[in-house]
C-alpha cells in the first residue's frame, strides 16, 4: 500500500550528477533477471493451452486459483514501489508512530473476508461493478466503472514514473530506459497471459520485494552493531514513538488516525477495488477466497515491519557515519535509495537486488491495473452493448484492451514527467476516489432503502467533497513557505550528521496555526476515505428517503448483507415499513425463486449455475420471501 507516499513530493532533477554510486555490470544483470523472469512466467501461461483459452481464463484465471498465490498477489498489488520508498523515509523523519497503521489491518481485512467476499462471490461476478447494476441499475454501474477507470489510469502512470525518476536521480540509471523496459515487459505478460500470469508473477515479485528489503536490514544492522544497537540509538534520540491518543482528526498521525482512519483506507483497497475483488473471485472456492484475505494480514504486518526497520536502520547508520551532501539535500522519495547505494556500494549485485525489489513493486501494481482495467472495460462497457460477441473475438478484444491500457500507462508516465509539483496531486487522486466508491458499495450492501437516484447523487457529492478537500489541502501546503521541523519542532533526535533540511515534513504547512478553510484542509489524509465514504452514505440515504426509497422497485435479495435485518428487527413494525425493509414491507416485490441475474454475453445463468449458487450459501427460506447470505464458516 502506498499510503505513506501519497504526499511525498518528487524531485525532478534528472541525470547522475548527484549520484552516490552507479550500477555495476552485476547490478544490471540482477535487475535484468527480474524483467526476464517476469516475462518468462507471463509467456509460459500465455503459451500454455494457446488456442484453447477462454475469456474466463484470461480475465478470471478460470476461477481455479489457490489460497497462497492469491494472498501474495493481493499483497503485491498495492505494495507499490512508492510505498517501499515512502514508509522507511517516514520512520526516518518522524519516528515510529506510523507503525500503528498495522492495527488497522485487522478490521481492514476481517470485514472484506466476512462481508464483501461472501456477497460478491455468491453473485458469481466478474466485475465488482456488476454488483451495482444488480443492486441499483445500469446507470449506477457505469458511474462506478468510469470512476474506477479514472482512478487507475491516473495512478498507474505515476506508479511507473515515480520510482524510475527517483532511481535516475540517485544512481544515474537512465530514466526512460527503465520506464520503457518496465512498461513493455509488464504490457506483454499481462496482455498475453491474463490474470493467471499476473498472479504468478506477483508471487515471484513479492518474494523479490521481501528479499531485497531483508538484505538491506541485515547488512545495515550488521554494519552498525546489530538490531539491539539500532533500537538503543533510535530510542535515545526519541525516534521510538509512544501512543499518541490525541483524538483531533487534524493531527496527521495519531493512534486513532492510523488504527481507525486506516481501516477505511484498507476497506477501499481490499474491499471494493476491482483489482482485489478480481483476485478473490478467481479463487477456486469461497473458502479459499476468505483464507487468502486472512493470509494477507500476517504478510502485511511483515511488510510494514520491514519498511519500518529499514527506516530505523537508516537512522542508526547515519548516526554513526557521515551523510553525503547529496543525501542532505535529497527529496523524501530519494532518501532510501541514497541510503541503499551508500550502504551496499562495495557489494556488487546487492544494489541491483534492491532496485529489483523496488521495481517488483511497480510491476505488480501496474500489471494489476492493466488487467483490472481491461476486465471492467470488457464486462461493464463493451459486453452489455455487444451481447452476441463470440468467444474468439472477446479474447482478442480483452488482450487488445490490456495492451491499449499499457500504452496509456506509458503516455501517463510521459505526462507525469511534465507535471512537476502537480505530480503529488496526481498521486493523491487515487486516495480521493477510493472513499466515495467504498461509500457507494456500503450504501447498497447495508441499506435496502437506498435507491439508484440516491446512489448517484451520493457518489457525485462524495467525489465533489473528496476533490475539494484533497486538492484544497495540496494547494494549501504548496502555498506554505515554511515547513515545521519534524517531531513537534525538535531537531534534538537527529543524528549529528543530519540536517533539518534533509528531513523536512512530507506534508508541510505554515508554522502559524491554520484557521478557517486552511484548518479544514488540514484533515489527516488517513481520514479522507472515512469522510468521503460517510458523505456518500449520508447523502445517498437522505435522497433515497426523500424520493420514496425502494417502493415499487424489485430488490435483488442476494445484493443485501444481512446485518441490518437483525438490528432493525428490534424496531417497531411501522418504522420497518417506513424504512422499506423488505422482510416486513409488502411494497417491495420479491419473486420467490429469483436468483441474482448474471449476464454473460447476453445470456442468463442456467439452472446449473443456480444450483451452484444454492450450494454456495444463497438459500431460499420457505417461511419468508427472502434470501439469507449464510455466515462464512472456516
From Swiss-Prot:
Q: What is this protein called?
A: Sodium-dependent multivitamin transporter
Q: Look up the record and give one Gene Ontology term from the biological process aspect.
A: biotin transport
Its function, per the record, reads: Sodium-dependent multivitamin transporter that mediates the electrogenic transport of pantothenate, biotin, lipoate and iodide. Functions as a Na(+)-coupled substrate symporter where the stoichiometry of Na(+):substrate is 2:1, creating an electrochemical Na(+) gradient used as driving force for substrate uptake. Required for biotin and pantothenate uptake in the intestine across the brush border membrane. Plays a role in the maintenance of intestinal mucosa integrity, by providing the gut mucosa with biotin.
The species is Mus musculus (Mouse)
Q: Where do transmembrane segments lie in this chain?
A: 23-43, 65-85, 100-120, 142-162, 175-195, 207-227, 255-275, 295-315, 350-370, 403-423, 427-447, 455-475, 526-546
- What are the record keywords, sorted? Biotin, Cell membrane, Glycoprotein, Ion transport, Membrane, Sodium, Sodium transport, Symport, Transmembrane, Transmembrane helix, Transport
Which first-to-last residue range defines the signal peptide? none
Q: Which NCBIfam families match?
A: sss (TIGR00813)
The record's section on Pfam families has: SSF
What does the domain comment read?
The C-terminal tail is important for biotin uptake as well as apical localization in polarized cells.
Amino acid at each position: 500500500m502506498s499510503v505513506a507516499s501519497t504526499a511525498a513530493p518528487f524531485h525532478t532533477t534528472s541525470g547522475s550528477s548527484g549520484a552516490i554510486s552507479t550500477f555495476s555490470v552485476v547490478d544490471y544483470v540482477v535487475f535484468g533477471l527480474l524483467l526476464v523472469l517476469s516475462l518468462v512466467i507471463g509467456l509460459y501461461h500465455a503459451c500454455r493451452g494457446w488456442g484453447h483459452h477462454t475469456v474466463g481464463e484470461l480475465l478470471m484465471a478460470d476461477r481455479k486459483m489457490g489460497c497462497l498465490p492469491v494472498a501474495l498477489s493481493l499483497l503485491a498489488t498495492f505494495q507499490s514501489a512508492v510505498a517501499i520508498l515512502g514508509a522507511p523515509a517516514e520512520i526516518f523523519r518522524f519516528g515510529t508512530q506510523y507503525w500503528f497503521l498495522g492495527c488497522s489491518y485487522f478490521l481492514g481485512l476481517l470485514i472484506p473476508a466476512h462481508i464483501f467476499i461472501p456477497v460478491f462471490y455468491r453473485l458469481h461476478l466478474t466485475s465488482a461493478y456488476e454488483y451495482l447494476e444488480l443492486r441499483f441499475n445500469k446507470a449506477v454501474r457505469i458511474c462506478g466503472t468510469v470512476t474506477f477507470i479514472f482512478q487507475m489510469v491516473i495512478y498507474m502512470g505515476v506508479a511507473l514514473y515515480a520510482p524510475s525518476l527517483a532511481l535516475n536521480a540517485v544512481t544515474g540509471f537512465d530514466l526512460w530506459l527503465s520506464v520503457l523496459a518496465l512498461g513493455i515487459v509488464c504490457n506483454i505478460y499481462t496482455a498475453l497471459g491474463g490474470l493467471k500470469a499476473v498472479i504468478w508473477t506477483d508471487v515471484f515479485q513479492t518474494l523479490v520485494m521481501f528479499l531485497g528489503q531483508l538484505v538491506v536490514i541485515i547488512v545495515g544492522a550488521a554494519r552498525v552493531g546489530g538490531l539491539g544497537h539500532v533500537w538503543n540509538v533510535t530510542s535515545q534520540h526519541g525516534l521510538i514513538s509512544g501512543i499518541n491518543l490525541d483524538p483531533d482528526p487534524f493531527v496527521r498521525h495519531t493512534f486513532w488516525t492510523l488504527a481507525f482512519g486506516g481501516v477505511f483506507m484498507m476497506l477501499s483497497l481490499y474491499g471494493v477495488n476491482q483489482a482485489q475483488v478480481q483476485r478473490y473471485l478467481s479463487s477456486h472456492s469461497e473458502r479459499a477466497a476468505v483464507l487468502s484475505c486472512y493470509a494477507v494480514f500476517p504478510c502485511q504486518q511483515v511488510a510494514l515491519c520491514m519498511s519500518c526497520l529499514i527506516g530505523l536502520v537508516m537512522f542508526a547508520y547515519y548516526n554513526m557515519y557521515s551523510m553525503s551532501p547529496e543525501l542532505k539535500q535529497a527529496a523524501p522519495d530519494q532518501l532510501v535509495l541514497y541510503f541503499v547505494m551508500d550502504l551496499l556500494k562495495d557489494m556488487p549485485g546487492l544494489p541491483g537486488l534492491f532496485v529489483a525489489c523496488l521495481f517488483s513493486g511497480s510491476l505488480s501494481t501496474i500489471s494489476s491495473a492493466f488487467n483490472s482495467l481491461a476486465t471492467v472495460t470488457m464486462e461493464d462497457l463493451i459486453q452489455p452493448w455487444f451481447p452476441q460477441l463470440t468467444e474468439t473475438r472477446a479474447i482478442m478484444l480483452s488482450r487488445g484492451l490490456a495492451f491499449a491500457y499499457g500504452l496509456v500507462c506509458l503516455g501517463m508516465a510521459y505526462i507525469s514527467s511534465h507535471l512537476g509539483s502537480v505530480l503529488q496531486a496526481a498521486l493523491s487522486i487515487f486516495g480521493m476516489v477510493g472513499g466515495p466508491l467504498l461509500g457507494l458499495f456500503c450504501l447498497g450492501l447495508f441499506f435496502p432503502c437506498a435507491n439508484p437516484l440516491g446512489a448517484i447523487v451520493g457518489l457525485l457529492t462524495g467525489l465533489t467533497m473528496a476533490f475539494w478537500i484533497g486538492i484544497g489541502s495540496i494547494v494549501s501546503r504548496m502555498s506554505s513557505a515554511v515547513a515545521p521541523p519534524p517531531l513537534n519542532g525538535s531537531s534534538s533526535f537527529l543524528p549529528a550528521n543530519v540536517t533539518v533540511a534533509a528531513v523536512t515534513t512530507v506534508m508541510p504547512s505554515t508554522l502559524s496555526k491554520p484557521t478557517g478553510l486552511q484548518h479544514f484542509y488540514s484533515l489527516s489524509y488517513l481520514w479522507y476515505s472515512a469522510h468521503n465514504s460517510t458523505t456518500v452514505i449520508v447523502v445517498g440515504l437522505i435522497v433515497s428517503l426523500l424520493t420514496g426509497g425502494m417502493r415499487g422497485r424489485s430488490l435483488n435479495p442476494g445484493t443485501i448483507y444481512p446485518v441490518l435485518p437483525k438490528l432493525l428487527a428490534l424496531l417497531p413494525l411501522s418504522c420497518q415499513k417506513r424504512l422499506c425493509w423488505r422482510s416486513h414491507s409488502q411494497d417491495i416485490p420479491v419473486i420467490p425463486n429469483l436468483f441474482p441475474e448474471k449476464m454473460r454475453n447476453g445470456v442468463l445463468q442456467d439452472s446449473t449455475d443456480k444450483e451452484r449458487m444454492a450450494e454456495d450459501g444463497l438459500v431460499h427460506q420457505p417461511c419468508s420471501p427472502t434470501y439469507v447470505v449464510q455466515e462464512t464458516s472456516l
